[in-house]
């Protein structure tokens, strides 16, 4: 599946019907999604501010709007279609340094030649000359009629996948506001998606957000091939990105799947501390269940064989649910 057919199906399967109101969504994002070790980090500059327990999250880090406070960045600007439910969809929202967020404004994202960059942003600093050290850690901006913003290298893929998500889920209102905005960015953000693949932090953030949005994830984080098939026409390059994520997921869950990747027949190794019943639920990247079966496993190590040879190549989400405790483990399987 590719092109408009894929885009339509992704919208049907992943567009959230449950969205928090804007006040609640900011507090939730700061406190529940992005706070790490009691601090928040700006998506663009890496600047961090403390966020202790017992405070109003949004107000505490805002610092009354000072340049080095933190507020909410809409990667798809509010003035260009991020209104209504889209305004509060956390899959395209991030904490940002107030001044950097303001400078980015409604400018499109894109690569900027160093010689043309007017402002370089790093942590709580700004400069007008090309940095001599750690240049990739800086975001860059151009103002004026031809304004543009380039995020730091380590988050370019995150930004790209947020933009593809927004344009897929809210295309009508995005195009109504400015039919050229996405097209201006498309070539660069396709490349960013390939150059900066999903890492564990982005994967886990996606899962956290889904918890507050009716279980709806950003599918472009789940399956790296979707952006290729829907927008970028470079599937071979894109699809190598998630292999390490798949392996890491398996190692951390007491759930081992092998061989993975594979051709459709694979095995689940389960270690049970007592006799127990499990359900294995396998979904494709459109959220459709393609396999659902219960298993009674014995105390000790168990091996279960699964066959999905009749299904298309791509990523599949495998959920293993302990019926007695209602605890689930989940991982990805890549079928060649």
Report the location of each language-model feature:
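Residue-level detector of functionally pivotal "anchor" positions at catalytic/ligand-binding pockets or at interdomain
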Residues: 234-258, 273
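C-terminal tail/sorting-segment detector
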Residues: 297, 305, 309, 313-336
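N-terminal module-boundary/linker segments of secreted carbohydrate-active enzymes
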Residues: 1-48
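Domain-level detector of nuclease and nuclease-like folds
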Residues: 60-71, 76-242
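Short coil/turn motif common to extracellular beta-sandwich-like domains
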Residues: 261-267
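A glycine-anchored, Pro-Gly-centered beta-turn/N-cap motif
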Residues: 264, 276, 300, 312-315
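Solvent-exposed serine/threonine-rich low-complexity stretches and specific carbohydrate-binding patches
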Residues: 291-298
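Short, glycine-anchored, charge-dense loop/turn motifs used at functional sites
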Residues: 283-290, 316
